[in-house]
Regions:
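Sequence signature of WD/YWTD-type beta-propeller architectures
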Residues: 119-570
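Compositionally biased, low-complexity repeat tracts
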Residues: 4, 27, 49, 54, ...
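C-terminal motif of bacterial Sec signal peptides marking the signal peptidase cleavage site
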Residues: 6-8
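Extracytoplasmic soluble-region selector
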Residues: 10-127, 131-132, 177-180, 203, ...
Length: 570
């Protein structure tokens, strides 16, 4: 304390000495700490850290309340700097992982590591196992028994999920005589087990977020085990395992798709557990929809019986181009500025004013050339199409098509340029530009497009070149690669991802008639699936695909279209 006497005053002023004066270094205690959580319930686990200051005179003092505390992985927990417990870290119970704890004062910094490990068992409250203690560590394990071991069938090995997915329904085949199951999620920092009496378990809410937050930095290994409560001596049968990861970047919230449940366009997304009908409010059938790149307009085919005609609406649900004006439509695409709408109908391309519906002419393709499935490039310079010379396509089917792009410049169309050649045994269709315009995703099949079980996803540079098969996305089920005839079609790129630390992946929705675990154990019903793409990869850029949680698995769902703008239709 310093005493100062002021001239002409009778009061003595006391000045408090700076407690950090002459501090030369900082230390954190304890160092390299670990928190192990065996119960995810409250109260939350805490760990008290101390900040120690070293001073020029050789002394060391506790300065915990005088420094700024931070942790570089806020998913693990936080320091309450506004409270009274300085240096007290409270675990979130919402993630396992590693972090760096830092303190700072007077330009000096100290760091230490913190590891949060989750080692817990959860009993399924909805379908509990028939008895307790069926998976005790002392019970013998048998791996790979062809009759008794269960088989994890969803998700597939190597699935990359977005961090905002609402839920994941893990599904497995039971194995003979088994009535109790244990699904284990394992990594360096996570040892989570769920015991259930069912052949499926849904991770949602807090547990879905826990898996996502933990797997962002390292893959999680998932394994299913099974036993029979009525058979002695007890044995635990171990099935296959899969690895899964979660990306840092997420696709937009909104995904529109057609559903046979309503014969209309549904509004959903990866963050939604269910979807609602967007349009129309009547029972009329609409489909083959597309959204303008700015999300302000939605075009679709409207069933006018016997014709299907163009109908467009704005984001508020107001009609722009009414179906009553009878402009035949199969597929459509907006110009990047949203001012023009190119419509394909039975192989003929016609351009319209998107705001008035006025005709702007027919695209000259040349003699015996037909085009369908148009998609306008983000820069407006080209329209990609499925181009055929064999026979005019219908709006439902195209044969022997090539992937081509048609130049466009201020109202003038150029000659179609072939990017991927087609033939009667090599059909290429549904080209779709990536958000940056560098790539085209498209579909390849060995025959006609309608109902093509051989349909698979492909990728090619937008200017042409060697095409890549999206082999994993198109042909992986569970642990098995190159599964044929999964009917993967209708690719749709998500707009630029929402990202936490920088965009790393592109997201591609598509339709596939593949099995979905034990819910849809056989192929044949089209559903919406999504794959993550690493566009920097020199090989197959795709990850194993995941099922869109908001759709109705009992009906056909197709034609996914992403949007960053919500349509409000009353």
């Amino acid at each position: 304390m310093v005493l100062v006497a002021l001239a002409g005053c009778t009061e003595t002023v006391q000045l408090t000495r700076d407690p950090l004066e002459n501090m030369v270094a900082l230390d954190i205690s304890p160092g390299d700490s670990t928190i192990k959580l065996t119960d995810l319930a409250e109260p939350h686990h805490t760990l008290q850290f101390l900040a120690m200051g070293r001073f020029a005179d050789g002394t060391t003092r506790d300065i915990t309340p005088l420094v700024t505390w931070s942790v570089d992985n806020g998913l693990l927990g936080e320091f309450d700097e506004m409270g009274r417990s300085h240096g007290l870290f409270t675990a979130s119970h919402a993630a396992a992982g590693r972090a760096k704890v830092s303190i700072e004062a007077r330009g000096l910094v100290a760091e230490t590591s913190l590891t949060v490990i989750i080692d817990a068992t959860i009993i399924d409250p909805v379908f509990p196992p028939p008895a307790a203690n069926l998976f005790e560590p002392a019970i013998p394990f048998v791996s790979g028994d062809p009759v008794r071991s269960p088989t994890l069938v969803y998700p597939a090995d190597g699935t990359l999920f977005p961090p905002n997915i609402v839920s994941t329904l893990f599904q497995w085949q039971r194995g003979s005589s088994n009535d109790a199951f244990r699904i284990v999620f394992d990594s360096e920092v996570l040892h989570l087990a769920v015991e259930t009496g069912s052949d499926r378990w849904q991770a949602d809410s807090d547990l879905q977020r826990l898996l996502a937050a933990t797997a962002i930095t390292a893959p999680i290994r998932s394994e299913v085990q099974a036993t029979a409560s009525t058979i002695a001596p007890p044995m635990i049968y171990v099935g296959n395992h899969v690895t899964m990861e979660f990306a840092l970047d997420a696709p937009p919230k909104l995904l529109y798709f057609w559903s046979a449940a309503t014969n209309g366009i549904m509004r959903g997304g990866v963050e939604e557990s269910s979807s609602g009908k967007l349009y129309p409010q009547s029972t009329k059938c609409v489909g083959c929809h597309t959204v303008s790149r700015d999300g302000a307009q939605l075009a679709m085919g409207y069933d006018n019986a016997p014709t299907t005609d163009l109908l467009t609406i704005d984001a508020g649900g107001g009609t722009i181009i009414p179906a009553s004006t009878t402009r035949p439509m199969g597929w459509a695409t907006y110009s990047p500025d949203g001012n023009k709408l190119l419509v394909a109908n039975n192989g003929v391309l016609k351009l319209y004013d998107a705001h008035t519906g006025g005709s702007l002419g027919t695209v000259p393709l040349g003699t015996m050339r037909y085009a369908t499935h148009p998609d306008w490039s983000p820069d407006g310079a080209y329209v990609a199409v499925a181009l055929t010379t064999i026979v005019a396509p219908t709006n439902m089917d195209v044969k022997a098509a090539s992937i081509a792009r048609i130049p466009y410049n201020d109202g003038t169309w150029g000659t179609p340029e072939i990017l991927v050649s087609g033939s009667m045994t090599s059909n290429n269709y549904f080209p779709r530009y990536s958000p940056g315009g560098d790539f085209l995703a498209y579909v390849h099949a060995t025959g006609t497009s309608q109902g093509a079980v051989s349909a698979e996803l492909m990728l090619v540079a937008s200017a042409g070149g060697m095409a890549k098969k999206l082999r994993i996305a198109s042909h992986r089920l569970g642990n098995t690669d190159d599964v044929p005839d999964l009917a993967s079609s209708m690719p749709a790129w998500a707009p630029k991802p929402q990202t936490m630390t920088g965009s790393e992946h592109a997201w591609l929705a598509f339709v596939s008639a593949r099995p979905y675990g034990t819910i849809l154990p056989t192929s044949g019903r089209g559903q919406i699936w999504i794959t993550a793409l690493d566009l920097t990869s020199t090989g197959d850029p795709s990850a194993a695909a995941f099922w869109l949680p908001c759709q109705d698995a009992t009906v056909v769902n197709n034609n996914p279209v992403w949007s960053e703008t919500d349509f409000v239709v009353n």
